[in-house]
Every structure is written in C-alpha cells, then in structure tokens.
Amino acid sequence: GCKILYFGIESANQRILNYYNKRITPEESRTAVRTARKAGADVIVGSFIVGAPDETREEIRNTIEFANTIPIDAPQFNILGVYPGTEIWDEFEAKGLLKGGEYWETGIAVSEICPTAVPYKEIRQMVHDGFYRFTRRPSYVSKQVARLMKSPYRIRTALNNLPRLGGIVGHHLRGRAGHRQRTGRAFRGLLVS
C-alpha cells in the first residue's frame, strides 16, 4: 500500500496561492491532509514555498505556523526560486531583474534579486526557526514516537537510516562544540544546524 504522501500545500495565504495559480485554498489543504491521515497514510509530508515577490513577513510566518496546525509528519519549507522555462522567469526577464542569461544554469532565489521580496537571509532564518519549532513541540514528538511504534515501515526506515543519523548528529556536535566553547551556552538541540 501507499506509505508516503507528499502534499504541495505551498502557502497558508490565499493571495500567494493565487499568485502560484494553485487553484486550492488553505482549508482544502487542511482537509486533504486530515483525510489522508484518517485513511491510514503512514507518512505525510507537507511542502511549502515561501519568498514570493510581494509576500510579506507576516504571510511567511503564517505559512510556517500553518504547518503546526495540520497533521503532517514533516514540513518541507522551500524558498521560491526562479528557473528558466517558468512563468516567473519570464516575468522577471520582462521586469529587467534577469539580464542576458544570468542564472540560466542554476536558477536563483526570488528574494536574492527581487527588490520587493523579503531578503533571502531573513527568510532562511524564519524557515530554520519554524522547522525547529515544528519538530520540538511535545505533541509532535509524542505522536511521532507513537507512530513509529505502530508502523513496521517507520521502524525499518529508522533502522536503515541509523548510520546517516549518526553522521548528522556527529557533524552537529562537532560544529556546536566550538560554539559552546566560545559562548559558554548549554547545548540546545541535536538536529539544529
């Protein structure tokens, strides 16, 4: 059967969903996720895109906080990028924000070239903080442990990823050791980079 569902929720703000031409509402996304959970979906990932050209800080925060209100197992927060062949690429070329083939091989975040966008570094910090808050909620942790114990798929996946998890934790501990020595602050969390 189906083990993982990946929902392209994108935003909790109708104005931004309209900009993306999504033809959905935040409430429809909420209903879809709840329905999938009730139907027995084992792992549900919610994908969100922040950093649209005129998206406000409050709208970005609203989207990040929306993830906490729906029964997903993991949020994937993406910062909107501009890539060749997309409508936004054409829009930005027409506005003169892209010149002579710049970024055609790699693309670029909207927030790095659009003067009306929230700055990239600020969005990145908001996303980082939002993911941290999402995964540190006591209700989230307890539900994930309970789901792990009930799901052979999750147990198998966790066991298969133990070496990877060890590498992530080790990398984090090595990076944080210098920080603790410089600041004298207590260790705050294992998976925050």
Name each model-derived stretch.
Residues 133-193:
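Membrane-proximal basic amphipathic "stem/tether" segments
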Residues 1-153:
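A structural motif corresponding to the C-terminal lobe/cap of the Radical SAM core domain
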